[in-house]
Regions:
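Nucleotide/phosphate-binding catalytic cleft detector across ATP-hydrolyzing
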Residues: 1-154, 164-228
Length: 228
């Protein structure tokens, strides 16, 4: 049996990889820092630490948008850097199971296949799995039971709501907004109410530390920004 298998979840914000052979699991920011426009300088959490702080010579980019590939070449480079250097894994003749959104087009699916098949690793097999099913299995749910289970996946650019039963999707709806929209709303509100420009990282900190789905919270937080 081949144990050289990797499970991969490409999120707009976070990137997750699991190695069956070693049992290692990593999750880092899906971010790349570039110099000279096309040379990878850093990736993952290291690149994200430069976001909104880097000089003009360093461009920090996010290679996925709304769950689909926005920058093919750099995403391909990053995935194999992660596996081979961070996880000390072997990619040649490996198998890859990739979680993808349910509503992507055939062209977008082909891009995920080519991400691996057109790489130097020459994989043995590449399989795509619909994200709601991967989420349910990861939560320990028996997806083959004749019981409807609702799975809600809230991401940076999308929110996917699905019902699973008997090993398949009964229905699924993908909405093209997510936590990034909340960050943008917080940035707009702070600017409108206080004439203060804050960055996305500050907005995320406000959301994560003070945000609540219920009224009545009274905590406060000091933030720093540009007075306009």
């Amino acid at each position: 049996m081949n144990n050289n298998i990797y499970g991969i979840d490409f999120g707009t914000c976070n990137f997750k990889v699991f190695s069956k052979a070693s049992g290692k699991f990593i999750t880092e920011k899906n971010t790349i820092a570039l110099i000279n426009k096309n040379q990878m300088y850093a990736y993952g959490d290291e690149a994200y630490a430069m976001y909104e702080k880097a000089p003009e010579s360093i461009n920090v980019v996010f290679p996925l948008s709304s769950g689909v590939i926005a920058d093919y070449n750099f995403l391909q480079m990053m995935i194999f850097e992660f596996i081979e250097k961070r996880m000390k894994g072997k990619t040649k003749n490996a198998e890859f199971l990739v979680a993808v959104p349910t509503d992507i087009t055939d062209v977008e699916k082909r891009a995920f296949f080519e991400l691996f098949y057109k790489s130097k690793s020459r994989p043995k097999n590449v399989m795509l799995c619909e994200k709601p099913l991967a989420d349910a299995v990861g939560l320990g749910i028996d997806v083959n039971e004749p019981t409807g289970v609702m799975v809600v996946d809230m991401g940076a650019d999308t929110i996917e709501i699905s019902v699973i039963s008997l090993g398949g999707l009964v229905l699924s709806d993908l909405m093209h907004f997510g936590s990034n929209r909340l960050d943008e709303s917080i940035i707009s509100y702070i600017r409108r109410e206080f004439n203060l420009v804050i960055g996305k990282k500050t907005a995320m900190a406000l959301k994560e530390q003070l945000g609540s789905g219920l009224p009545g919270r009274t905590e406060t937080m000091v933030v720093v920004g540009l007075d306009v």
